[in-house]
Amino acid sequence: MRSETLRRAASLLVVLAAVALVGCGHSAPPANAELKAAIADLEKAVVAAKAEVQRLKDVDDLENLAGIYGHYVDKNRHDDVADLFARDGVVEIYGRGAFLGQDRVREYMHNLSPGSVGPRDGSLFNHMHLQTVIDVQPDGRTAFVRSRPFIMFGIVNANAQWGVGGYENVFVKEDGVWKLGYLHGYYTMYTNYEDGWTKKATPIFGEYARLPPDRKPTVQYAAYPAAFVPPFHYKNPVSGRADHYGDPTFHDSQKQ
C-alpha cells in the first residue's frame, strides 16, 4: 500500500512540475496577476508534493530497517545489527540497562550469545515486529517507530519460551542514511511454553553481571502479571489527547 501511495505521489509530482514548467515557459505576453498567482500556487504544490514523496520514501525505508534489524538479531548476526546503529546509538532492552555508542552496542549484541555468530542447529530465536507505527518528524532527520514483538525462543530437547512486549525506537538520518538512534525494547510478558501465561510468568531480566551497562534502565517496570504499557510517543490521532500511559516528552527524556 505504501509503495502504491509513493508511486501516485511521484506521478502527481511529475504532473505538477510539467504544468508549472508550461506556465513559466509560455511565450505569450507577460502574465497577469492571476496567472502569476496560479504559477506561485503550482510551485508551492510542487514543493509540498516533493516533501510528501520524501516522507513516504522515509516511511518505507524505516519499515524496512526495523524489519532488517529483526532478521539480523534473530540469527545472531551481531555485527550486522551493530552496523545498523548511528555512531552515538543506544540500545536498551528491558532491565539490562542502556549501552551507549555503536561500539558498546556491538559488545552488547555479541554478549547475547558469547562465542557464537550466526544461526545454530537446535536453536530457535524469532521475534516478529507487529503493529508498526511510524512517525517521521518535520525535520526529516528523526523518526519515532513503535512496534510489538512476538517472541519464540527455544533449545531443542531443553526448553522453550515465548513472550510479547513493545519497542519504542528513535531513528536518525546520519550521512543521509536512516539508522537506529535509540533502540528501546520493553518485554512485558515472558513464560515457558509448557505452562504458558496462565500458570507461570518470568520476572523481568536484570543487568548482565559480565557486562554492566553504561546507564541504569530509563524506565522501571514489572512484567506480567503486572500491567505495564510502554509509553506512547504519539497522541491519539483523532482526539489529540495523550494516552494515560504516554508522555509527550518521553523521547526528549531518553536523549538526555
Regions found by a protein language model. Name each.
Residues 2-13:
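Bacterial N-terminal signal peptides that target proteins for export
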Residues 152-161, 190:
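Short, cysteine-centered beta-strand-loop-beta hairpins and adjacent loop/turn segments enriched
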Residues 129-134, 166-172:
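Hydrophobic/aromatic beta-strand elements that line small-molecule binding cavities or substrate pockets
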Residues 11-22:
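Bacterial N-terminal signal peptides
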Residues 25-60, 175-256:
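Terminal "cap-and-tail" regions of soluble proteins that handle hydrophobic small molecules
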